[in-house]
Amino acid sequence: MRLLNIVSSPRGARSASIAVARAFVDAYRQTGATIDVDTLNVWEEDLPDFDSGAIGAKYKGVANAPMDEAEQSIWRRIQSLVKRFQDADRIVVGVPMWNFGYPYKLKQLIDLVSQRNMLFTFDGNAYAPLLEIPRALVIHVRGQSREPGAGADNPGFRHQADYIEFWLRFIGVSEVRSLTVEHTWGARASDSIERAQARAVEMAAEF
């Protein structure tokens, strides 16, 4: 069993999303199956820029057209990242909320690996996923809550979760489970994170 653990917070030991994901992964290791954890930290990986060179390689790759040496180098790096998704049996993603969205490095990873004929297909009429991953867990972390009057009941607060969960289904994850962690700053942070870690342990048993 290969678990792809995507880390998108740069805060290390101070990160709520990393703390909750670690509790989940540690508990999942105790479920009896042999678990190989592949941790993909978007802040530590040497992610290539998705610039004109990468986009040029992308379109040549789709068209099976010859690439120059620089494009081949970028394309090999993209293929290496894609393979980590292709090899995964389960996915865990920790996503702190940044300005109602997600860390830009996570979006960079998504842009790099979301390649036609690698993670999805398109026949001119419809898209179809190429992965066959039974389930993923997304840990959504935000400092505010959806309590009445807190402001987080605005539909914009769903943007983060809707996008990440849609993308996972788009590439071939059958079931996307979510764990939302709120109040991750101030006096309530410690209790909120501990409750989320306890819930993560429970969820690991059925993952």
UniProtKB/Swiss-Prot annotation:
Q: Please indicate if the UniProt record lists NAD as a keyword.
A: yes
Q: What is its EC number?
A: 1.6.5.-, 1.7.1.17
Taking the record's annotation, the residue ranges forming a coiled coil are none
Molecular function terms, GO-annotated: electron transfer activity; FMN binding; oxidoreductase activity, acting on NAD(P)H as acceptor; oxidoreductase activity, acting on NAD(P)H, quinone or similar compound as acceptor
Q: Please tell me whether the keyword Aminoacyl-tRNA synthetase is annotated for this protein.
A: no
State how the cofactor is bound: Binds 1 FMN per subunit.
Q: Keywords for this entry?
A: Flavoprotein, FMN, NAD, Oxidoreductase
Question: What InterPro entries does this protein's entry cite?
Answer: Flavodoxin_fold, Flavoprotein-like_sf, FMN-dep_NADH:Q_OxRdtase_AzoR1, NADH:quinone_OxRdtase_FMN_depd
Pfam families, alphabetized: Flavodoxin_2
This molecule's function is given as: Quinone reductase that provides resistance to thiol-specific stress caused by electrophilic quinones. Also exhibits azoreductase activity. Catalyzes the reductive cleavage of the azo bond in aromatic azo compounds to the corresponding amines.
Question: PANTHER family annotated for this entry?
Answer: FMN-DEPENDENT NADH-AZOREDUCTASE 1 (PTHR43741), FMN-DEPENDENT NADH:QUINONE OXIDOREDUCTASE (PTHR43741:SF4)
Oligomer and partners: Homodimer.
Q: What is this protein called?
A: FMN-dependent NADH:quinone oxidoreductase 2
Q: Per the UniProt entry, what species is this protein from, by scientific name?
A: Burkholderia lata (strain ATCC 17760 / DSM 23089 / LMG 22485 / NCIMB 9086 / R18194 / 383)
Lineage of the species this protein comes from: Bacteria, Pseudomonadati, Pseudomonadota, Betaproteobacteria, Burkholderiales
